[in-house]
Structures are given as C-alpha cells and as structure tokens.
UniProtKB/Swiss-Prot annotation:
The chain crosses the membrane at residues 33-53, 77-98, 113-133, 178-198, 226-246, 288-308, 320-340, 347-367. One of its GO terms (biological process) is mitochondrial electron transport, ubiquinol to cytochrome c. Keywords: Electron transport, Heme, Iron, Membrane, Metal-binding, Mitochondrion, Mitochondrion inner membrane, Respiratory chain, Transmembrane, Transmembrane helix, Transport, Ubiquinone. Belongs to the cytochrome b family. PANTHER family: CYTOCHROME B. It is found in: Mitochondrion inner membrane. This is Cytochrome b. GO terms for molecular function: metal ion binding; ubiquinol-cytochrome-c reductase activity. It comes from Petaurista xanthotis. Its main location: mitochondrion. InterPro entries: Cyt_b/b6_C, Cyt_b/b6_C_sf, Cyt_b/b6_N, Cytb/b6-like_sf, Cytochrome_b, Cytochrome_b_C_euk/bac, Cytochrome_b_N_euk/bac, Di-haem_cyt_TM.
C-alpha cells in the first residue's frame, strides 16, 4: 500500500512543499524568514479576525470600539497588541528576508523575486490602511497626508484623491472602505504567497554559496522543520516580550488622542517601518518628485536582476560588494532615523544625502564594483 502522503491529491501538494521538498543542505538561518513570514501572516489574520468582531468602522465610534476591545473584551488588550506589534515583527522579517535575497543573489529567480516585490507593496498597503482604523490623531492625519500625495499626479490627481476619500476630506466613507480593504488584502497576500512558493519550488531554493546545489539536497522534513522551529520560538518570544512588557514602544502617543480634523499634530509621521520611505519622500522639495522617489525606493528592487553585473551569484566571495551592502543597510537605518525627526536643520540635509546615497549605491556603485570584482578575478 502506497503512502497516503504521496498519493492523496491534496496532501501530495503539502508533501511536495513542506515534507519531501529537496532543499540545499547548506542553507543558513537567513532562510528561516520565509516560514516566519507565513507565521506572521497567519497570526495577523487570526488576531485581525477577532478584532473585526468588535470593531466598528464609523468615525463616531471607531476610537471608542478600540478602547472597548482593550477594556471590556476578554483578553482584548492582548489581541489588539499582538496585532499591532505583530505588524512590526512582520516588517522586521520582511526586510531581513529581502536583505537576504539581495545579499545572496536570490533575485536571479525573476518570477519569485517579482512576485515578492508585489507582495511587499501589498503588505505595505495593508499596514497603512490598518494604521488608519483606530481613528486616533496620527491615524487621521497619516491617512490625510499619504492619500493627498496622489494629488501630485498630473491632471487626474485631485479627482483621484477625492474618489479615494469618498468625499472632500478623510471621513466616514474613507474609514469604511479602508476597513473593507484592510480585511480583504491579507487574503490576497496569502494567495500571492502561495504563488511566490509555487515559483520558488519550480527552481528550488538558492543557497549561501550561490552555486548549483542539485548534487547535495536533503528533505525539508525533519531537518529544516526543526531548524525553522527555532526561528519560530525566537519570534514568539520577541513578540510576547514586546506585547507584555512595552506594547506601546513602537506606537505613537498621538494615536491615543481621538482624531480631530481641526487640530494638526506637530509632527505627522507613519509607523516606524515606513520611515525610511517617508524620509526619501520628504528629502525632495518638489511634491511630484517626492512621490516618484517614494515609489521608486521600493520599485527599484525589481531592477536588481537587470543591474546584476557580477559573474558570481551571491556576495559570499565578494568582499567589496559586501562592504557596499552593509553601507546600504546603514544608510537605510539612517533614513529610518531621519524619517522620525522634525523637518529642520541638520536633519533635512542628512536625509537628502542619505537618499542620494541609497539610489547611487543601487543604480551605479554596486554594478560597477561587481564589474571590478570580475576584473580582479580575471573573468
């Protein structure tokens, strides 16, 4: 009798994806983030579902409903903070996952990489809409400022913004539609993640050396299921420490003040995981230019397969490129810091320099250094 795992049409798919999947034997802990992102997504969908049972998407009651969840619902405070801080963990894992892809040249799998970039955009859109829902000051003004950026689009901009708002300002219609989209998008993310995996399993995983690993593959289970469990435990530990000891550490105090269209907060800023893009947006004095820079700061990831000039795949044996990669990482941390600072000297000039450096490294320096490394290796 054959094993049901290998014959049943449904179980067979799971088997080929998570059990008998041939996996390079030398993949490091940097390859754990895919499974961690899956865990984050499931956590966010489940906690979000329970929050949606008690939340009301009406401008008069939204803020009160969140307070009600925290005060009156059994473990409502836990569900709410798991959801809010779970988003932060999601983005930490996302950025590390993308960073791994850049470092080890995983972007040479075009379809997997491009679906991944689309996934990143979708998750960012979901997180932005979710931030609007508690209807605090930063929710309202964040929604107003970010949606208003679309008015920079020539000719149709203003009409587009009013169409998204459902009126002449961010109001009840906006909140209702954002709640609807925030509810549906995670399921679209889940579907895209499946397509992401589908394309990945067509080619097989990359590995730290960047070499073809067909001759040295081992089954995913039990080796990497056990390895992934370590990452899962560390993620849960970090999330629970954050939720139970300092749940508001990554939030904004302004969001504990109900939304007031007549009172603008002194410093409007998004959640910490968008600050690097926000800093790039602010560093360009022109509105349309800023919006384009904001979009291209993420869209530029799609250019990596085209800009890859090295004869080697990953950066494991390329010390010059490694240096540049870590300068880029430090630059992104600098941009994140600048995004949270007020628009005044010296932060303006630091932000502008960091933005220029970001695009210069990716578009010019990294491809040239890769060519130089080819020369040094007489290739």
């Amino acid at each position: 009798m054959t094993n049901i795992r290998k014959t049943h049409p449904l179980i067979k798919i799971v088997n080929h994806s998570f059990i008998d999947l041939p996996t390079p034997s030398n993949i490091s802990a940097w390859w754990n983030f895919g499974s961690l992102l899956g865990l984050c997504l499931v956590t966010q969908i489940l906690t979000g579902l329970f929050l949606a049972m008690h939340y009301t998407s009406d401008t008069t009651t939204a803020f009160s409903s969140v307070t009600h969840i925290c005060r009156d619902v059994n473990y409502g405070w836990l569900i709410r903070y798991l959801h809010a801080n779970g988003a932060s963990m999601f983005f930490i894992c996302l950025y590390l996952h993308v960073g791994r892809g850049l470092y080890y040249g995983s972007y040479t799998y075009f379809e997997t990489w491009n679906i991944g970039v689309i996934l990143l955009f979708t998750v960012m859109a979901t997180a932005f809409m979710g931030y609007v829902l508690p209807w605090g000051q930063m929710s309202f003004w964040g929604a107003t400022v970010i949606t208003n950026l679309l008015s920079a689009i020539p000719y149709i901009g203003t009409n587009l913004v009013e169409w998204i708002w459902g009126g002449l300002s961010v109001d009840k219609a906006t909140l209702t539609r954002f709640f609807a989209f925030h509810f549906i998008l995670p399921f679209i993310v889940a579907a895209l993640a499946m397509i992401h995996l589908l394309f990945l399993h067509e080619t097989g995983s990359n590995n730290p050396s960047g070499l073809i690993s067909d001759s040295d593959k081992i089954p995913f289970h039990p080796y990497f299921t056990i390895k992934d469990i370590l990452g899962v435990l560390l993620l849960i530990l970090t999330l629970m420490i954050l939720v139970l000891f300092s749940p508001d550490l990554l939030g904004d105090p302004d969001n504990y003040t109900p939304a007031n269209p007549l009172n603008t907060p002194p410093h409007i800023k998004p959640e910490w995981y968008f600050l690097f893009a926000y800093a790039i947006l602010r560093s360009i004095p022109n509105k349309l230019g800023g919006v384009l820079a904001l979009v291209f700061s993420i869209l530029i990831l799609m250019l990596f397969p085209i800009l890859h000039t090295s004869k080697q795949r990953g950066m494991m044996f390329r010390p010059l490129s490694q240096c540049l990669f870590w300068i880029l990482a430090a630059d992104l941390l600098t941009l994140t810091w600048i995004g949270g600072q007020p628009v005044e000297h010296p932060f303006i000039i630091i932000g502008q320099m960091a933005s220029i450096l970001y695009f210069t490294i990716i578009l010019i320096v990294l491809p040239l250094i890769s060519l130089l490394e080819n020369k040094l290796l007489k290739w």
